Amino acid sequence: MMSFKKIAAAVMAVAMTLAVVPSAFACTALYVGSDLTEDGTTMFGRIEDLGTNDYNKLFYVSAAGNHKAGEVYDGCYGFTYTFTHDSYSYTARRDDNTSGVCPDCDGTHDHTPYEEAGTNEKGVMVSATESLYGKDAALAVDPYVDDGIEEAEITTVLLSEAGTARKGVALLTSIYENAGAAGGAGVFIGDQNETWFVENLTGHTYVALKLPDSVVFMQPNVSAIGKIDLDDTDNVIASADAISVAQEAGTFVGDAAANVIDWNASYNNEDNARTPAGLNYLNGVDTYTEDNYTE
């Protein structure tokens, strides 16, 4: 079992490494299992490839009890959440609203603007805000919810509330089921024992996958989850309607009788060339020099 320090360091290392990605209006997430690193470290993270400096970042500490039991958190776009206990302390990265105005929603109410990633006192780590886009036909059946949870609010809620990665997964998927999601997202949730990856591409459907140590993947704003067995409950947690929504939309790919779905093919709007390009780089097929990067 890897130590908390190694995992936490890995999260930051990935974020810093990916910062050399060429400028683009996009985001890129990366996971490297412990079997594929020299020192047995699990690595995951995400970079904001905006190509501009319009969203300055703050790395800060949210003190224990910053949110009180029973307090209602009012997010950027109408999502609300009632905290079940005094919040855990955590360190995180968020957008800078020291001017008093949120750079994301222009709101002046008390909320955390675009909290992207962090680690709480229980050793739970979250890397969120990797935007995903569902098929129009699937969204017609299960549309996004205007006041559902938005990707930038996930880190705030989970790090405040969850004492383990598994509890974080349970909390997030419960929110998807009940309040719904305002948009699609890919989210890493990890602790000293395991790392999970959660995707949603419509308002209420989702899949959470326990990530093996032998896998590397990158996610450039497209679904990274392919064919999965929904009966593999040790490693897969999915919404009860994961198959039926896709069937109603006419987008289902898989074997319904065997409870198997190709998640990407059924829900992802479209793939892009950034996926093979990134994997070719990680696999050593392509190499890059400093001259390949724009100033």
Where are these regions (language model features)?
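Bacterial N-terminal signal peptides that target proteins for export
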Residues: 1-11
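Sec/Tat signal peptide C-region and signal peptidase I cleavage site
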Residues: 21-26
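Hydrophobic core
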Residues: 12, 16-20
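A contiguous strand-loop segment
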Residues: 27-150, 171-295
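Residues at the start of alpha-helices and the adjacent loop-to-helix junctions
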Residues: 5-7, 18, 160
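Short, well-ordered beta-strand elements within core beta-sheets of diverse protein domains
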Residues: 155-161
